Amino acid sequence: MRFEQPLEEGRLLRRYKRFLADIESAGGERLTIHCPNTGSMLNCMSEGCRVWFSRSNDPKRKLPGTWELSETPQGRLACVNTARANRLVEEALLAGDIAELAGFTALRREVAYGVENSRADFRLEYPTGALFIEVKSVTLGFDETAVAAFPDAVTLRGAKHLRELAALAREGIRAVQLYCVNLSGVEAVRPADEIDPAYGKALREAAQAGVEVLAYGAEVTTEGLHLARRLPVRL
């Protein structure tokens, strides 16, 4: 996935009201842009950190740009635009780059399922039946180690999705929790038990119920993203 237009570089002044960020562009222009991330963005929003943003040409838009990338304190690039994760996964699925999920005959997005009124990010159809996928975007790295973690904030919704996937797996339906790691320099993924122990517990229970837990790491550059390789998940 290449960015639709060249990204512009700047530095972060502050993030506030969840969806807003003030930045200063490389040319000294101060802008308020859209922050497309509802998480805590730990290690992605240090004051003064380098950021990259896409600028909109739509005159009807209230904000002139969207925050796309951050440089972490460890010098890694993180894609903070969580909407990119689903697009990146879909691109990889259609290209056959996720070997464990290859061979499907149809793909549907945002499919309702489960007793808790959830929506799967993707439903794939195979000659043998359906498969449901939940995608999570991972950008959290605590230190110099090459292990990323999820979530970066307590997520009741994420735990609900795991319960729904586990229920499918118990019925003999393939269910997948797929972590899209949009952080460079990562070699493995784990649940962030120190942030949300309930999520970590739900993930382990889902895996025991038969949910397939996969992680794929993206190559993150200022030109674009590419889901490059499978990463181990340390439960």
Swiss-Prot record:
GO molecular function terms attached to this record: DNA binding
Gene3D superfamilies xrefs: 2.40.50.580, 3.40.1350.60
Coiled-coil region list: none
Domain of life from the UniProt record: Bacteria
InterPro entries: SfsA (IPR005224), SfsA_C (IPR040452), SfsA_N (IPR041465)
Family: Belongs to the SfsA family.
Protein name, UniProt field: Sugar fermentation stimulation protein homolog
